[in-house]
Amino acid sequence: MCVNFVPGIKKIYSQKQTHAQALEILLCFCRKISGFDESQLQKASAYEAMLEAAKHGIVEFIIEMTRVCPDLLWVVDEDLRGIFSHAILCRREKIFNYIFQLKGSRQLVTSHIDAFDNNMLHLAGMLAPSSELDLRPGAALQMQRELQWFKVFIPLAHFI
């Protein structure tokens, strides 16, 4: 196979295989939990997995899990922050867009208040995690990205 002869291609091919295998495991897990009740989902750590996927921006995970168990979309942590809140806090644009485009979710997610009385505007105004800020060199570019992120929420303020 010519994959071994081209530098860099082997690494990409390996990553693609790993992604395909992870997706297959996810689909198997989804088939397994499709009939689970709330306590079984808790025991299977499905709630924690959803929140972690939101924090890390793994939109495929959120899509597949909510396809088999739509109630997982509304899971919250001890601070009453759900998937949407973590997507905002961690600047996970794909997850934000996925949830925001879902029918009937716009009013629910925009009006949600966490345990600290923060709504989505407050969360958007908080500083991004350092791992996200470090993706952009220089304070000016970091500030520009933070401002762009916050401006997304200005038109949505009337929902709050």
Q: Where are these predicted regions, by residue range?
A:
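Acidic, Ser/Thr- and Pro/Gly-rich low-complexity regulatory segments
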Residues: 1-160
